[in-house]
């Protein structure tokens, strides 16, 4: 199971989409306060639809609170346009933490500097500032899952009425 960390997310629709992705992949969602919305926000829950009952979401008052709790048991990877390595060049392991910053500013530079060897980026055209947060989470999380043979996820689909 992977861990997705959102540091001070601002847009409820993004967090709702990420919540749905985490529920669908059986990943834990860690939210670092302050949040730019109320958890009861209908746009947040609408984006997550009926998946909330399957979501494991945990709240923290600071990134340091989360990091101190898990730093000795898992790897932390910090996603940023300023990352040292491409996200696809890392060998992700079950239990790893994928850390994403707020939509308008990303992760704080001191945090990136402190963990520079574990900063990752998603390659993109240099004329654009960044990708959408929920797309970045999905892309990175599914790469981590792919590398681990999608462990724990449904291995095949089923067409209605098909007998094989």
Residue ranges and their predicted role:
Residues 1-164:
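Post-transcriptional modification and biogenesis factors for structured RNAs
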